[in-house]
Amino acid sequence: MRISKQRKKTTLAQQGRYLLICLLSMMLLFLAGSMIILNRTQRQVYERLEEISKLYTDELDNRFFRISRNLFSTVMDSSNPDSDFWKYMDLMEKDQYEEYVVTQLRKKYVSAAWDFGTDYNVFLYTQKDDSLYQLSISSDGFYAIDPYLQEALKRRINSLSQQTYAVKKKWTVMQQGDEVYMLKVAQNQGVGLGCYVNLKTILEPFSKLSLGKSGYVSLVDQNGKNIVTVTEKGIVRDSSQLDTGNYTFRQTLSQSPFEIQIKISWTGI
């Protein structure tokens, strides 16, 4: 009788162990399945964001190229008697027509805001009197330019005056205060037609993506120097506390000396 009770206790204990093993096995299978689904979801998110970033960088390169081609074709057309731009430049040689010429050119470049966006600023530079005029209208509806930026642009233009202009040549970089700009200028016969854009505006669209709590998008130069960083909260002035070397994927800009590095963090998504 005692042996029968002991066997019964042993059988119940074994059944309990078997049940526990089955439950643990089922839990492990569930966790494994969840991990597979999670990994698949992560891959799909990575692939989708990488696809979006590729489309955006392609659009940036295309925009930079179209602007470069526009500047080049306009400035290098000085021998064409039908060139409106050079007719205006001839008038500008007469000081009393300066205001008229600038007004007419601004009317001509109103479309630049639609073609390239208000962040891309087209300007005219005349070497004769070292003057720089904003031609494209800004997002606030004005043609004003910061005087410190204006002087910085003049210095950079003069430093580029001896270099041969090429449509496919990468845009140059200049810094003014805490801001970094990309610049392209075509020069001919003492006249320069150019465009500049603040680098942080290039990255702002990425702040709309689900990058995660510690995710970021950085613009990095050819030497690996971090130029501008964006998180879901916006532009980051001090990126020293971010692990900016541990990115998920990157996209190279062919028209400028930069690459865009993107990190996706699953924490907080």
Language model region names:
Residues Q14, E47-A152:
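Extracytoplasmic/periplasmic sensory segments of membrane signal-transduction proteins
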Residues D84, D130-S138, Y181-L183, G224-T231:
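Amphipathic coiled-coil signal-relay and dimerization helices
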Residues V191, L211-Y216, V220-I269:
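Extracellular/periplasmic juxtamembrane segments that couple receptor/chemosensory ectodomains to their
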Residues L135, Y143-K154, Q175-S210, I262-S265:
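Conserved beta-strands of PAS-like sensory domains
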Residues I3, R7-E47:
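Extreme N-terminal signal-anchor transmembrane helix of membrane signaling/transducer proteins, especially
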Residues K170-G177, K184-N188, G245-Q255:
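Short acidic-hydrophobic surface loop/beta-edge motif
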Residues Y148-K169, S240-G245:
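Soluble sensory domains of the PAS superfamily and closely related sensory modules
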Residues Q104-T118, N188-V228:
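Solvent-exposed, extracytoplasmic
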